[in-house]
């Protein structure tokens, strides 16, 4: 066996899970994890939720402490950037000019925030929520009575809005889309989210394009939009993320809205794998390549990468699943909603709880979204796996058990 280590580029959730899985399968393999941040690996979902509310929420993002990595003999090189992959020499070049050979390489480089595209005046801070440092900086600004402008009506923007309202801030959400959660979920779910926040005092400016973030004369900021100005003490931008593919692209690997890999996390270079939300991975259940920004991918896909690094032939095959917690509301989504689907609403979409099912052209259930009905997601998973084709009227009737359709 080569004395060269397994090298993991990235030090986030997917990187940690890759290292855990490698160590579980091979007690002796040398493992090196390289990350640009100086923090220990942490899970990101808490950053836009509990980490904005209290210190305990931030601490829960750190699943493993430094002693665990030492005990597992996983070498951490934090605050270090990989500048290049030298594929022929099978080594990576670091930002200090040194190189590190690898037996196999895993790219778990994750993603970065999509930044605001308009001008921002000097001295004005536009907050993002991607790192622990981001969450700390924003939490310090969420003081009761402050005006908070949130640019973006997706999951991150709404979670930040919920946290800010819980802390007593006055919140306005601004989004160019006509409705909330427009990119991922049916209209009925976005309408429910709108009511949920509206009832708690969040203001909305939908179908509104932010153009610039200016410094206000008396302090704070002004968000200039195509429909007027929004005055704020704190501005938060939550308009999506971009996969960190530059390292892979410079190395000549296939990149297509993510690092393109097969179901086994393999790139075209059999010494290089990729895992986590940076991957455009083939999903056997969907029959196509997808890039999914979710905790589930970071949690479970790395086990497949680790197994195949060591010679297995496993495949990552899970339906996309994600969740969002806003106030006392839990929203879960399974599968992918898309054009051409028929939606069936089960329950009370005005007050909740309710579930929305997406039916494909042949009548099979292909997706589901549940508001405060997590058990329906478990049932939907079984129905999708069984290829269930329920009668839409019966499916919409909450008195008819979902088991009936199996």
Swiss-Prot record:
> Which terms in the Gene Ontology molecular function aspect does this entry carry?
ferredoxin-NAD+ reductase activity; oxidoreductase activity, acting on NAD(P)H
Question: In which residues is FAD bound?
Answer: 5-37
Q: In which pathway does it act?
A: Aromatic compound metabolism; anthranilate degradation via hydroxylation; catechol from anthranilate: step 1/1
Cofactor field: FAD
Disulfide bond residue pairs: none
Q: Which Pfam families match?
A: Pyr_redox_2, Reductase_C
Protein name in the entry? Anthranilate 1,2-dioxygenase system ferredoxin--NAD(+) reductase component
Please state the gene responsible for encoding this protein.
andAa
């Amino acid at each position: 066996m080569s004395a060269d280590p397994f090298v993991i580029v990235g030090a986030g959730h997917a990187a940690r899970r890759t290292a855990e899985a490698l160590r579980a399968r091979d007690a002796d393999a040398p493992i090196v994890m390289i990350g640009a941040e100086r923090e220990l690996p942490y899970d990101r979902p808490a950053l836009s939720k509990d980490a904005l509310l209290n210190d305990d929420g931030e601490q829960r993002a750190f699943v493993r402490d430094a002693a665990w990595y030492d005990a597992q003999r996983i070498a951490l090189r934090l605050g270090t950037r990989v500048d290049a992959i030298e594929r022929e020499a099978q080594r990576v070049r670091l930002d200090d000019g040194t190189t590190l050979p690898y037996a196999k390489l895993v790219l778990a480089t994750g993603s970065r925030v999509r930044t605001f595209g308009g001008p921002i005046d000097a001295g004005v801070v536009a907050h993002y929520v991607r790192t622990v440092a981001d969450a700390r900086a924003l939490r310090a600004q969420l003081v009761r009575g402050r005006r908070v402008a949130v640019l973006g009506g997706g999951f991150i923007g709404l979670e930040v809005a919920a946290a800010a309202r819980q802390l007593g801030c006055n919140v306005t959400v601004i989004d160019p889309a006509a409705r909330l959660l427009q990119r991922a979920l049916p209209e009925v779910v976005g309408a429910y989210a709108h009511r949920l926040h509206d009832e708690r005092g969040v203001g909305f400016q939908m179908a509104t394009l932010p153009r610039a973030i200016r410094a206000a004369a008396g302090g704070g900021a002004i968000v200039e939009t195509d429909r007027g100005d929004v005055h704020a003490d704190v501005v938060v931008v939550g308009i999506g993320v971009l996969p960190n593919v530059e390292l892979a692209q410079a190395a000549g690997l296939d990149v297509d809205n993510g690092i393109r890999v097969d179901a086994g996390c393999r790139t075209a270079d059999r010494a290089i794998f990729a895992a986590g939300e940076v991957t455009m991975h083939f999903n056997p259940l969907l029959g196509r390549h997808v890039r999914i920004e979710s905790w589930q991918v970071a949690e479970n896909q790395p086990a497949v990468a680790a197994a195949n690094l060591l010679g297995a032939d496993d495949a990552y095959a899970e339906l996309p699943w994600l969740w969002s917690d806003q106030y006392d509301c839990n929203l879960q989504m399974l599968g992918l909603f898309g054009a051409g689907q028929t939606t069936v609403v089960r329950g009370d979409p005005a007050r909740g709880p309710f579930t929305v099912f997406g039916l494909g052209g042949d009548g099979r259930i292909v997706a589901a979204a549940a508001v405060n009905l997590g058990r329906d997601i478990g049932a939907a998973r079984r129905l999708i796996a069984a290829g269930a084709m329920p009668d839409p009227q019966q499916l919409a009737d909450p008195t008819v058990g979902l088991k009936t359709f199996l």
